[in-house]
UniProtKB/Swiss-Prot annotation:
Entries under CDD domains matching the protein: GDPD_like_SMaseD_PLD
Protein source organism: Loxosceles variegata (Recluse spider)
Tissue specificity field: Expressed by the venom gland.
Disulphide bridges, residue numbers: 45-51, 47-190
Catalytic reaction list: an N-(acyl)-sphingosylphosphocholine = an N-(acyl)-sphingosyl-1,3-cyclic phosphate + choline; an N-(acyl)-sphingosylphosphoethanolamine = an N-(acyl)-sphingosyl-1,3-cyclic phosphate + ethanolamine; a 1-acyl-sn-glycero-3-phosphocholine = a 1-acyl-sn-glycero-2,3-cyclic phosphate + choline; a 1-acyl-sn-glycero-3-phosphoethanolamine = a 1-acyl-sn-glycero-2,3-cyclic phosphate + ethanolamine
Gene Ontology cellular-component annotations: extracellular region
EC number: 4.6.1.-
Required cofactor(s): Mg(2+)
Name the record gives this protein: Dermonecrotic toxin LvSicTox-alphaIC1aii
GO biological process annotation, one example: lipid catabolic process
Gene Ontology MF annotations: lyase activity; metal ion binding; phosphoric diester hydrolase activity; toxin activity
Alphabetic keyword roster: Cytolysis, Dermonecrotic toxin, Disulfide bond, Hemolysis, Lipid degradation, Lipid metabolism, Lyase, Magnesium, Metal-binding, Secreted, Toxin
């Protein structure tokens, strides 16, 4: 999965998919009442990027739905996964359940079209703090209450705070999550970070007894870091330059070991070599 980083305007969906992304990451800001408000990152952000792209969240969802609905004029067949990076800094911990509820209602109406031929992409809810685990509970219970529990098959989870993996496991236990888990690791492209925690996450994924199904590393812009990530056997690379990821995947060392995921690849299944 080649995950285009910080895709916060509708034009950027076309731009990043055009460069080779089959997945995008979108930042979601919340208002004081825990309503998802904008797709917006803000300052500071990755080096070499404009931090200010912003779209009303529901308008973004409608455009994203068009981009992932077969037959639509804006449809991109290869866009199959969307990571919502939930920027919860404006929320108190006790608003997590509310935020999950409101996020679910927004997605149900504007992305899934109330279950009537909505967008088909898989969705990852990426949460920055473990103590916001009730966001997952609120999201799941809302879809169940609205009669659309089936859509949870399309939803996965990530805690993005680079916490100790055993602590991540505990948070999922509290939230009742037993699958559909991606584990992110990374840092802004302005700084360097080693691969030791990525390797620990991959080991958990491959142990057969851990909770992790997939691992992605962010933000990977350099060719050398891309190779290091692939050598560590990650499932996803989040990048500002998807064309570089595509280029490296075509190198002799990688083209027989990796391929770009399609809609038929289940993002919640751990890959077995």
């Amino acid at each position: 999965w080649i995950m285009g980083h910080m895709v916060n305007s509708l034009a950027q969906i076309d731009e990043f998919v055009g460069l080779g992304s089959n997945s995008i990451e979108t930042d979601v800001s919340f208002d004081k009442q825990a309503n998802p408000e904008y797709t917006y990152h803000g300052v500071p952000c990755d080096c070499g990027r404009s931090c200010g792209h912003s779209t009303k969240f529901n308008d973004f969802l409608k455009g994203l739905r068009k981009a992932t609905t077969p037959g639509d004029s804006k449809y991109h067949e290869k866009l199959i996964l969307v990571v919502f990076d939930l920027k919860t800094g404006s929320l108190y911990d006790n608003q997590a359940y509310d935020a999950g509820t409101k996020l679910a209602k927004n997605l149900l109406q504007h992305y899934w079209n109330n279950g009537n031929n909505g967008g088909r992409a898989y969705i990852i809810l990426s949460i920055p703090k473990l103590n916001l685990y009730k966001l997952i509970t609120g999201f799941k219970e809302t879809l169940k209450n609205e009669g659309h529990e089936d859509l949870l098959e399309k939803v996965g989870h990530d805690f993005s705070g680079n916490d100790d993996i055993s602590e991540v496991q505990k948070a999922y236990n509290k939230a009742g999550v037993t699958g559909h888990v991606w584990q992110s690791d990374g840092i802004t492209n302005c700084l360097l970070r080693g691969l030791s925690r990525v390797k620990a996450a991959v080991a958990n994924r491959d142990s057969g007894s851990g909770i992790i199904n997939k691992v992605y590393y962010w933000t990977v812009d350099k060719r050398s870091t891309t190779r290091d990530s692939l050598d560590a056997k990650v499932d996803g690379i989040m990048t500002n330059y998807p064309d570089i990821t595509v280029e490296i995947l075509n190198e002799d060392a990688y083209k027989t070991k990796f391929r770009i995921a399609t809609y038929e690849d289940n993002p919640w299944e751990t890959f077995k070599e």
